[in-house]
Amino acid sequence: MQNQNASLTGLQMLQDEMGRQHKDALSSFHLAEPIAVEIAASLKNTGRLMLLGMGASHWVNRIVEPAYRAAGIDATAQVISEYLRAPIAGKPMTQILTSQSGGSGEIIRYLDDTPDHTHFFGLTLDSNSPLAQRLPSLIGAGGVEKAFAATRSILISLALHAAVLEKLGLPQDQLLAALSNPVECDDAEAVELLAKSKCIIFSGRNLLQGVADAGSLCLMELGRIPTLSLEGGQFRHGPFEVLKPGIGVILLAPVEDESDSVKRLASECVAAGMRPVLFDLRGGEAPEGCVTISLPNRPGMGGAAEAVVAMQAALVKAAALMVPEVGTPLRSSKVTNGE
Protein backbone atom coordinates (compact mmCIF):
# COMPACT_ATOMS: atom_id res chain seq x y z
CA MET A 1 0.00 0.00 0.00
CA GLN A 2 2.88 2.38 0.80
CA ASN A 3 4.43 1.87 -2.66
CA GLN A 4 1.02 2.31 -4.28
CA ASN A 5 0.46 5.60 -2.43
CA ALA A 6 3.92 6.81 -3.44
CA SER A 7 2.93 6.51 -7.10
CA LEU A 8 -0.34 8.46 -6.73
CA THR A 9 -0.65 12.21 -7.22
CA GLY A 10 -2.07 14.35 -4.43
CA LEU A 11 -5.35 14.63 -6.33
CA GLN A 12 -5.56 10.87 -6.88
CA MET A 13 -5.01 10.28 -3.17
CA LEU A 14 -7.83 12.68 -2.32
CA GLN A 15 -10.13 10.98 -4.80
CA ASP A 16 -9.25 7.56 -3.38
CA GLU A 17 -10.10 8.69 0.17
CA MET A 18 -13.40 10.23 -0.92
CA GLY A 19 -14.31 7.20 -3.02
CA ARG A 20 -14.40 4.88 -0.02
CA GLN A 21 -15.48 7.23 2.74
CA HIS A 22 -19.15 6.20 2.83
CA LYS A 23 -18.32 2.50 3.19
CA ASP A 24 -15.69 3.13 5.85
CA ALA A 25 -17.93 5.54 7.78
CA LEU A 26 -20.79 3.04 7.80
CA SER A 27 -18.47 0.30 9.07
CA SER A 28 -17.08 2.68 11.69
CA PHE A 29 -20.55 3.40 13.05
CA HIS A 30 -21.34 -0.27 13.59
CA LEU A 31 -17.90 -1.20 14.96
CA ALA A 32 -17.98 1.67 17.48
CA GLU A 33 -20.74 0.28 19.70
CA PRO A 34 -18.65 -1.06 22.64
CA ILE A 35 -16.70 2.18 23.16
CA ALA A 36 -19.77 4.28 22.33
CA VAL A 37 -21.56 2.60 25.23
CA GLU A 38 -18.65 3.48 27.55
CA ILE A 39 -18.57 7.11 26.43
CA ALA A 40 -22.34 7.49 26.75
CA ALA A 41 -22.18 6.07 30.28
CA SER A 42 -19.42 8.55 31.16
CA LEU A 43 -21.45 11.44 29.73
CA LYS A 44 -24.52 10.42 31.70
CA ASN A 45 -22.30 10.45 34.79
CA THR A 46 -20.59 13.82 34.21
CA GLY A 47 -23.16 15.65 32.06
CA ARG A 48 -20.25 17.64 30.60
CA LEU A 49 -18.20 17.06 27.43
CA MET A 50 -14.99 18.68 26.27
CA LEU A 51 -14.15 17.99 22.62
CA LEU A 52 -10.45 18.59 21.92
CA GLY A 53 -8.52 18.48 18.66
CA MET A 54 -6.44 20.36 16.09
CA GLY A 55 -7.01 21.24 12.44
CA ALA A 56 -9.87 19.39 10.78
CA SER A 57 -10.34 17.33 13.95
CA HIS A 58 -11.37 20.51 15.74
CA TRP A 59 -13.86 21.38 13.00
CA VAL A 60 -15.41 17.92 13.28
CA ASN A 61 -15.82 18.69 16.97
CA ARG A 62 -17.55 21.95 16.06
CA ILE A 63 -19.97 20.05 13.82
CA VAL A 64 -21.03 17.63 16.56
CA GLU A 65 -20.98 20.09 19.48
CA PRO A 66 -24.61 21.23 18.89
CA ALA A 67 -25.71 17.60 18.47
CA TYR A 68 -24.40 16.69 21.92
CA ARG A 69 -26.15 19.73 23.35
CA ALA A 70 -29.38 18.54 21.73
CA ALA A 71 -28.84 15.26 23.61
CA GLY A 72 -28.76 17.18 26.90
CA ILE A 73 -24.97 17.28 27.30
CA ASP A 74 -23.12 20.49 28.23
CA ALA A 75 -20.67 20.23 25.33
CA THR A 76 -17.80 22.51 24.31
CA ALA A 77 -15.37 22.16 21.39
CA GLN A 78 -11.95 23.69 22.03
CA VAL A 79 -8.71 23.87 20.08
CA ILE A 80 -6.40 21.73 22.19
CA SER A 81 -3.38 24.04 21.79
CA GLU A 82 -5.49 26.79 23.37
CA TYR A 83 -6.84 24.46 26.04
CA LEU A 84 -3.30 23.49 27.01
CA ARG A 85 -2.68 27.11 27.93
CA ALA A 86 -6.06 27.88 29.51
CA PRO A 87 -7.78 24.71 30.76
CA ILE A 88 -11.25 24.88 32.26
CA ALA A 89 -11.28 24.16 35.97
CA GLY A 90 -14.25 22.90 37.91
CA LYS A 91 -16.50 19.88 37.90
CA PRO A 92 -15.45 16.56 36.34
CA MET A 93 -16.05 16.25 32.61
CA THR A 94 -15.84 13.66 29.90
CA GLN A 95 -13.14 14.47 27.34
CA ILE A 96 -12.84 13.15 23.78
CA LEU A 97 -9.44 13.79 22.20
CA THR A 98 -9.59 13.62 18.41
CA SER A 99 -6.64 13.07 16.07
CA GLN A 100 -7.05 11.17 12.80
CA SER A 101 -3.40 10.09 13.00
CA GLY A 102 -3.48 9.61 16.75
CA GLY A 103 -0.09 11.28 16.86
CA SER A 104 -0.76 15.02 16.91
CA GLY A 105 1.92 16.75 18.98
CA GLU A 106 -0.61 18.72 20.99
CA ILE A 107 -2.57 15.58 21.85
CA ILE A 108 0.57 13.82 23.07
CA ARG A 109 1.64 16.80 25.15
CA TYR A 110 -1.80 17.08 26.73
CA LEU A 111 -1.79 13.40 27.70
CA ASP A 112 1.72 13.78 29.14
CA ASP A 113 0.77 16.90 31.11
CA THR A 114 -2.49 15.47 32.48
CA PRO A 115 -1.85 12.52 34.81
CA ASP A 116 -5.49 11.68 35.57
CA HIS A 117 -7.22 10.27 32.50
CA THR A 118 -10.51 9.42 34.19
CA HIS A 119 -13.38 9.97 31.71
CA PHE A 120 -10.84 10.48 28.88
CA PHE A 121 -11.47 8.88 25.47
CA GLY A 122 -9.82 9.07 22.07
CA LEU A 123 -11.05 9.20 18.48
CA THR A 124 -8.62 8.21 15.74
CA LEU A 125 -8.22 6.27 12.50
CA ASP A 126 -5.03 4.53 13.67
CA SER A 127 -5.52 1.70 16.16
CA ASN A 128 -1.75 1.52 16.74
CA SER A 129 -1.28 5.23 17.43
CA PRO A 130 -0.16 6.72 20.75
CA LEU A 131 -3.69 8.05 21.33
CA ALA A 132 -5.32 4.65 20.80
CA GLN A 133 -2.71 2.96 22.99
CA ARG A 134 -3.18 5.37 25.89
CA LEU A 135 -6.96 5.88 25.94
CA PRO A 136 -10.03 3.75 25.20
CA SER A 137 -10.79 5.02 21.71
CA LEU A 138 -13.32 5.14 18.93
CA ILE A 139 -11.42 3.72 15.93
CA GLY A 140 -12.35 4.55 12.35
CA ALA A 141 -12.46 1.76 9.77
CA GLY A 142 -10.17 1.60 6.75
CA GLY A 143 -6.90 2.75 8.28
CA VAL A 144 -5.25 6.15 8.45
CA GLU A 145 -5.93 8.88 5.93
CA LYS A 146 -3.07 9.26 3.44
CA ALA A 147 -4.15 12.35 1.49
CA PHE A 148 -3.02 15.74 2.79
CA ALA A 149 -6.36 17.48 3.35
CA ALA A 150 -9.01 15.85 5.55
CA THR A 151 -11.88 14.28 3.59
CA ARG A 152 -12.63 10.69 4.55
CA SER A 153 -11.56 11.25 8.16
CA ILE A 154 -14.28 13.88 8.62
CA LEU A 155 -17.12 11.60 7.54
CA ILE A 156 -15.74 8.71 9.59
CA SER A 157 -15.45 10.93 12.67
CA LEU A 158 -19.06 12.04 12.25
CA ALA A 159 -20.12 8.39 12.12
CA LEU A 160 -18.17 7.58 15.29
CA HIS A 161 -19.79 10.47 17.16
CA ALA A 162 -23.17 9.38 15.81
CA ALA A 163 -22.67 6.00 17.49
CA VAL A 164 -22.28 7.81 20.82
CA LEU A 165 -25.22 10.12 20.17
CA GLU A 166 -27.46 7.15 19.45
CA LYS A 167 -26.56 5.69 22.84
CA LEU A 168 -27.57 9.04 24.35
CA GLY A 169 -31.02 8.69 22.80
CA LEU A 170 -30.66 10.56 19.50
CA PRO A 171 -31.65 8.20 16.64
CA GLN A 172 -29.21 8.23 13.73
CA ASP A 173 -31.45 6.89 10.96
CA GLN A 174 -30.81 9.95 8.78
CA LEU A 175 -27.05 9.64 9.06
CA LEU A 176 -27.15 5.94 8.24
CA ALA A 177 -29.35 6.66 5.23
CA ALA A 178 -26.87 9.29 4.02
CA LEU A 179 -23.97 6.85 4.38
CA SER A 180 -25.88 4.04 2.65
CA ASN A 181 -27.04 6.14 -0.31
CA PRO A 182 -24.21 8.35 -1.64
CA VAL A 183 -25.40 11.18 -3.88
CA GLU A 184 -23.46 12.87 -6.69
CA CYS A 185 -24.31 16.53 -7.19
CA ASP A 186 -24.20 18.62 -10.34
CA ASP A 187 -21.60 21.11 -9.14
CA ALA A 188 -19.93 22.14 -12.42
CA GLU A 189 -21.22 25.73 -12.33
CA ALA A 190 -20.24 26.15 -8.68
CA VAL A 191 -16.76 24.72 -9.29
CA GLU A 192 -16.13 27.12 -12.18
CA LEU A 193 -17.27 30.08 -10.08
CA LEU A 194 -15.22 29.15 -7.01
CA ALA A 195 -12.07 28.47 -9.04
CA LYS A 196 -12.06 32.12 -10.17
CA SER A 197 -12.29 33.51 -6.62
CA LYS A 198 -9.33 35.16 -4.91
CA CYS A 199 -10.82 34.73 -1.44
CA ILE A 200 -13.88 32.80 -0.20
CA ILE A 201 -16.16 33.32 2.79
CA PHE A 202 -17.95 30.27 4.22
CA SER A 203 -21.03 30.50 6.43
CA GLY A 204 -23.66 28.23 7.95
CA ARG A 205 -25.83 27.71 11.00
CA ASN A 206 -25.89 25.14 13.80
CA LEU A 207 -24.16 21.87 12.78
CA LEU A 208 -23.52 23.26 9.31
CA GLN A 209 -21.31 26.03 10.69
CA GLY A 210 -18.80 23.34 11.63
CA VAL A 211 -19.10 22.03 8.08
CA ALA A 212 -18.37 25.54 6.80
CA ASP A 213 -15.33 25.74 9.09
CA ALA A 214 -14.02 22.43 7.73
CA GLY A 215 -14.54 23.62 4.16
CA SER A 216 -12.65 26.82 4.85
CA LEU A 217 -9.63 24.88 6.08
CA CYS A 218 -9.83 22.46 3.14
CA LEU A 219 -9.67 25.23 0.55
CA MET A 220 -6.81 27.01 2.31
CA GLU A 221 -4.85 23.77 2.26
CA LEU A 222 -5.67 22.74 -1.31
CA GLY A 223 -6.45 25.97 -3.19
CA ARG A 224 -3.85 28.06 -1.30
CA ILE A 225 -6.15 31.08 -1.12
CA PRO A 226 -7.33 33.03 1.93
CA THR A 227 -10.67 31.91 3.31
CA LEU A 228 -12.81 32.97 6.25
CA SER A 229 -15.57 31.03 7.99
CA LEU A 230 -18.22 33.01 9.87
CA GLU A 231 -21.39 31.81 11.57
CA GLY A 232 -24.39 33.33 9.79
CA GLY A 233 -25.10 36.01 12.37
CA GLN A 234 -21.43 36.95 12.68
CA PHE A 235 -21.16 37.26 8.90
CA ARG A 236 -24.00 39.78 8.83
CA HIS A 237 -22.67 41.85 11.74
CA GLY A 238 -20.03 43.91 9.96
CA PRO A 239 -18.03 41.56 7.69
CA PHE A 240 -20.52 42.20 4.87
CA GLU A 241 -18.40 45.28 4.13
CA VAL A 242 -15.72 43.11 2.49
CA LEU A 243 -18.03 41.89 -0.30
CA LYS A 244 -16.73 42.87 -3.74
CA PRO A 245 -15.82 41.26 -7.07
CA GLY A 246 -13.25 38.50 -6.70
CA ILE A 247 -14.59 37.28 -3.36
CA GLY A 248 -16.61 34.07 -3.32
CA VAL A 249 -19.32 33.15 -0.83
CA ILE A 250 -20.39 29.63 0.17
CA LEU A 251 -23.55 29.26 2.27
CA LEU A 252 -25.00 26.09 3.80
CA ALA A 253 -28.75 25.95 4.45
CA PRO A 254 -30.03 23.22 6.82
CA VAL A 255 -33.41 21.50 6.86
CA GLU A 256 -34.26 23.12 10.18
CA ASP A 257 -35.86 26.56 10.57
CA GLU A 258 -32.44 28.23 10.36
CA SER A 259 -32.63 27.64 6.61
CA ASP A 260 -34.76 30.76 6.20
CA SER A 261 -32.09 32.97 7.75
CA VAL A 262 -29.42 31.47 5.49
CA LYS A 263 -31.51 32.09 2.39
CA ARG A 264 -32.13 35.68 3.47
CA LEU A 265 -28.37 36.02 3.81
CA ALA A 266 -27.98 34.62 0.29
CA SER A 267 -30.42 37.21 -1.07
CA GLU A 268 -28.51 39.99 0.69
CA CYS A 269 -25.26 38.73 -0.86
CA VAL A 270 -26.90 38.86 -4.30
CA ALA A 271 -28.09 42.41 -3.59
CA ALA A 272 -24.47 43.31 -2.78
CA GLY A 273 -23.42 42.14 -6.25
CA MET A 274 -22.25 38.66 -5.27
CA ARG A 275 -23.16 35.27 -6.71
CA PRO A 276 -23.09 32.95 -3.69
CA VAL A 277 -22.92 29.17 -3.88
CA LEU A 278 -25.73 27.71 -1.77
CA PHE A 279 -25.67 24.10 -0.54
CA ASP A 280 -29.35 23.61 0.21
CA LEU A 281 -30.74 20.77 2.34
CA ARG A 282 -34.16 22.34 2.77
CA GLY A 283 -35.31 22.63 -0.82
CA GLY A 284 -38.11 24.89 -1.95
CA GLU A 285 -37.54 28.07 -3.88
CA ALA A 286 -33.89 29.04 -4.16
CA PRO A 287 -32.97 32.73 -4.02
CA GLU A 288 -32.45 34.25 -7.47
CA GLY A 289 -28.86 34.96 -8.38
CA CYS A 290 -27.37 32.01 -6.44
CA VAL A 291 -25.69 28.91 -7.73
CA THR A 292 -27.72 26.34 -5.80
CA ILE A 293 -26.66 22.76 -5.14
CA SER A 294 -29.69 20.83 -3.91
CA LEU A 295 -28.99 18.09 -1.37
CA PRO A 296 -31.20 15.36 0.13
CA ASN A 297 -33.63 16.70 2.72
CA ARG A 298 -31.98 15.42 5.90
CA PRO A 299 -31.88 16.98 9.38
CA GLY A 300 -29.19 16.78 12.05
CA MET A 301 -26.15 14.57 11.57
CA GLY A 302 -27.55 13.19 8.31
CA GLY A 303 -27.68 16.68 6.86
CA ALA A 304 -24.17 17.44 8.10
CA ALA A 305 -22.88 14.30 6.36
CA GLU A 306 -24.58 15.22 3.07
CA ALA A 307 -23.17 18.76 3.24
CA VAL A 308 -19.65 17.59 4.09
CA VAL A 309 -19.49 15.22 1.13
CA ALA A 310 -21.01 17.61 -1.41
CA MET A 311 -18.89 20.55 -0.34
CA GLN A 312 -15.60 18.67 -0.22
CA ALA A 313 -16.22 17.30 -3.73
CA ALA A 314 -16.76 20.80 -5.11
CA LEU A 315 -13.79 22.25 -3.24
CA VAL A 316 -11.36 19.55 -4.40
CA LYS A 317 -12.44 20.10 -8.02
CA ALA A 318 -12.13 23.89 -7.67
CA ALA A 319 -8.71 23.61 -6.03
CA ALA A 320 -7.52 21.37 -8.87
CA LEU A 321 -8.25 24.28 -11.24
CA MET A 322 -6.49 26.79 -8.96
CA VAL A 323 -3.09 25.20 -8.39
CA PRO A 324 -0.81 22.64 -10.06
CA GLU A 325 -0.16 19.41 -8.15
CA VAL A 326 -3.16 19.99 -5.90
CA GLY A 327 -2.98 17.98 -2.69
CA THR A 328 0.82 18.10 -2.52
CA PRO A 329 1.67 20.46 0.37
CA LEU A 330 4.47 22.99 0.08
CA ARG A 331 4.88 24.00 3.73
CA SER A 332 2.86 21.53 5.79
CA SER A 333 2.67 17.84 6.65
CA LYS A 334 -0.15 15.43 7.39
CA VAL A 335 0.86 14.92 11.03
CA THR A 336 1.88 18.14 12.73
CA ASN A 337 3.35 19.27 16.03
CA GLY A 338 2.71 22.95 16.70
CA GLU A 339 4.29 22.70 20.14
Label every PLM stretch briefly.
Residues 10-48, 137-250, 258-259, 321-339:
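Active-site phosphate/pyrophosphate-binding segments
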Residues 1-3, 35, 108-109, 195-196:
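An N-terminal domain-start capping segment
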Residues 2-13, 268-339:
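Phosphate-moiety recognition in structured ligand-binding domains
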Residues 3-7, 65-66, 109, 219:
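Short secondary-structure boundary segments
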Residues 44-186, 205, 240, 245-298, ...:
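Glycine-rich phosphate-binding loops that contact phosphosugars or nucleotide phosphates
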